[in-house]
């Protein structure tokens, strides 16, 4: 619930508020939708989280997204190979911000989503 989330004070360097909380709901809803649409038996954590973070950042207002991206150290990954389970486990905020920045730079985003769901990318 929101009251528990609010105890964190900040997330992605942004003060906790209801708008930020609603993007967390988008993140979790994406997990549920993706789970029904993966075409492989065991998608990787990086595949699941990449999609969820892209949806979360996409659900943010432009102003909130800019604040969250500024509050997170990123390099601007150009390769999906950089999205590893270790990055997610040790720095999930960075993983999420990098995922959104990467996805935003992809010309055919629909094809990328299909490739993730098919296990063609972000796999073991």
Regions found by a protein language model. Give the residues of each.
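Active-site recognition of the HExxH zinc-binding catalytic motif
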Residues: 23-36
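Extended hydrophobic/Leu-rich segments
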Residues: 5, 49, 113-116
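Intrinsically disordered, low-complexity N-terminal regions enriched in serine/proline/glycine
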Residues: 1-4, 20, 52, 87, ...
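Post-HExxH zinc-binding segment in Zn-dependent metallohydrolases
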Residues: 44-76
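Soluble non-cytosolic domains of exported or imported proteins
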Residues: 15-24, 42-47
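Active-site scaffold of zinc-dependent metalloenzymes
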Residues: 1-18, 32
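Long, well-structured alpha-helical subdomains associated
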Residues: 63-124
């Amino acid at each position: 619930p929101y009251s528990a989330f609010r105890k964190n004070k900040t997330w992605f360097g942004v003060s906790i508020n209801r708008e930020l909380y609603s993007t967390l709901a988008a993140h979790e809803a994406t997990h549920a939708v993706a789970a029904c649409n993966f075409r492989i038996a065991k998608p990787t954590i990086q595949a699941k989280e990449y999609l969820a973070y892209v949806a979360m950042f996409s659900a943010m207002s432009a102003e909130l997204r800019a604040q969250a991206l500024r509050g997170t150290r990123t390099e601007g990954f150009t390769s999906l190979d950089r999205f590893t389970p270790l990055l997610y486990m040790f720095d999930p905020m960075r993983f999420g911000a990098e995922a959104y920045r990467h996805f935003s730079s992809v010309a055919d985003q629909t094809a990328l989503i299909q490739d993730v769901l098919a296990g063609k990318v972000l796999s073991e």
